[in-house]
Amino acid sequence: MNNNDKWARYCDLLYSDDSLGFWLDISRMDVAINDFEDFNEIYSKAFDALESLENGSIANIDEGRQVGHYWLRNPKVAPSPEISDSITKEIQDISKFGSSILNGEITNSDGEKYTDVFWIGIGGSGLGPLLIKESFKRESIGLDLHFLDNVDPEGISHKLNSILPNLNSTLFVVVSKSGGTPEPLIGMEQAMKFVRDNNQNWSSRAIAITSKGSKLDLLAHNENWLDIFDLPDWVGGRTSITGAVGLLPAALIGADINKFLNGASQMDALTRVKDIKNNPAALLSLAWFKSGNGKGLRDMVVLPYRDRLEVFSRYLQQLVMESLGKKFDRDENQVNQGIAVYGNKGSTDQHAYVQQLRDGIDNFFVNFIEILHDPLEIVEVKNKRPGDYLSGFLQGTRSALTEGGRQNLTITFKSFDESSLGALIALFERAVSLYAELINVNAYNQPGVEAGKKAATKIIKLQKEIEELLDDGKQRTLNEINDALSSDSTESIYLILRKLSENSDHYSMIGNQSNPDKLIISKT
């Protein structure tokens, strides 16, 4: 393709919106102009499905739930006055709470301002707030955020001890829709013990984000926690960032939450247009579909050329992979769908895996994210402007990939602020919703995650049974333990006991670890 043809194709496939300062270029993806006509019928159905979802239909059929994260940034589109009013009130309450913390109306027991937040949440309840922090921490006039998003004992110990110097001025936020998810529950229990062991009051500094009537909601009310914010059952964790899960950390670091919501709402409006060529989410989802032949045959590589978006690829991993990675479609056909997502940041990628992207296996497409405006405080030194080099690296990598026949698309924003982040998140949320309609999967459930939780619960139950069996002090082989417990996995018993023996002197495994079936197990 010569230069004139490339330019003509670029102009034909470019989408832009002046109000958001936004461009989407899919000209280097496997999309043809006639695809707009060929896909018109299936997209017409997808647009109608998304409209029905926003109108309050039970879109998550498996769980019998509405899907309402699009209402969060524009309460007026919610399907009932009750929902609309509750969203509006929540936004106002969070804004007021954030201001009260920042201006010192709410203080610790010594009358001092809070300086830190210890955030306990897993999955989207941790990734969303982390993205908020990383995106706006340079403009922050507020609190420093720390995250506990795992049950790694070493990680828990390190993170709790790291806040010890400022413990008296640290808020604790616990995020759990049900209040029973193991990771945030264990994190909360450890944090609670840590605070009390250091002679501090937990309830006066604890905040819950949870569903009304949940175990966490009841606990927070009974113990008179500092505040409680709502996580409705019609909002999933991976799409909760425009609710309390994202707004509270934004408010606590001094970001403009209304600007963030307005950006998302503006993008929602652009992506309600029922015309593929004039709908950026439709263009994006079509590019994904064509690239992977509708079967997710290509990975999505996310390369934002801006440090503040470094964790965006991790955020998209959950949004895209948990939403689209499904074994069965909605008609119960086995389809094994999904798109794998990974990424880095530019120009770090230049010195990491771009080598393989350019010359290795062709099983991906690249999603570049570009920000045009550079901060004024970084000036030219020795005739070099860092922003020019960053842009040059992006354009150069893009050209090198195209020359190698590698598909790529570019999302560009004029500047990066709360509005553009809200718009960027909304763009991908809407593209995921439309893509799910194209491949006929439920984007709002997570049966694989639930299966993992059930399996983990089974392992914990088995461990307790092993401990009780070995309380008699008798020596046994693994097979004898397995038979006594009528277990279906000797391997699981071995793995449990290997862990126990490493962490407790009461358990012993005598014998050669290379022959685990010969080991003699006992408890003293």
Curated annotation (Swiss-Prot):
<dbReference type="GO" id="GO:0005829">
    <property type="term" value="C:cytosol"/>
</dbReference>
<dbReference type="GO" id="GO:0004347">
    <property type="term" value="F:glucose-6-phosphate isomerase activity"/>
</dbReference>
<dbReference type="Pfam" id="PF00342">
    <property type="entry name" value="PGI"/>
</dbReference>
<comment type="pathway">
    <text>Carbohydrate biosynthesis; gluconeogenesis.</text>
</comment>
<comment type="function">
    <text>Catalyzes the reversible isomerization of glucose-6-phosphate to fructose-6-phosphate.</text>
</comment>
<keyword id="KW-0312">Gluconeogenesis</keyword>
<dbReference type="GO" id="GO:0006096">
    <property type="term" value="P:glycolytic process"/>
</dbReference>
<feature type="active site">
    <location>
        <position position="351"/>
    </location>
</feature>
<feature type="active site">
    <location>
        <position position="453"/>
    </location>
</feature>
<dbReference type="GO" id="GO:0048029">
    <property type="term" value="F:monosaccharide binding"/>
</dbReference>
<dbReference type="InterPro" id="IPR001672">
    <property type="entry name" value="G6P_Isomerase"/>
</dbReference>
<feature type="active site" description="Proton donor">
    <location>
        <position position="322"/>
    </location>
</feature>
<keyword id="KW-0413">Isomerase</keyword>
<dbReference type="InterPro" id="IPR046348">
    <property type="entry name" value="SIS_dom_sf"/>
</dbReference>
<dbReference type="InterPro" id="IPR035476">
    <property type="entry name" value="SIS_PGI_1"/>
</dbReference>
<protein>
    <recommendedName>
        <fullName>Glucose-6-phosphate isomerase</fullName>
        <ecNumber>5.3.1.9</ecNumber>
    </recommendedName>
</protein>
<dbReference type="InterPro" id="IPR035482">
    <property type="entry name" value="SIS_PGI_2"/>
</dbReference>
<comment type="pathway">
    <text>Carbohydrate degradation; glycolysis; D-glyceraldehyde 3-phosphate and glycerone phosphate from D-glucose: step 2/4.</text>
</comment>
<dbReference type="GO" id="GO:0097367">
    <property type="term" value="F:carbohydrate derivative binding"/>
</dbReference>
<dbReference type="GO" id="GO:0006094">
    <property type="term" value="P:gluconeogenesis"/>
</dbReference>
<comment type="similarity">
    <text>Belongs to the GPI family.</text>
</comment>
<dbReference type="InterPro" id="IPR018189">
    <property type="entry name" value="Phosphoglucose_isomerase_CS"/>
</dbReference>
<keyword id="KW-0963">Cytoplasm</keyword>
<dbReference type="GO" id="GO:0051156">
    <property type="term" value="P:glucose 6-phosphate metabolic process"/>
</dbReference>
<keyword id="KW-0324">Glycolysis</keyword>
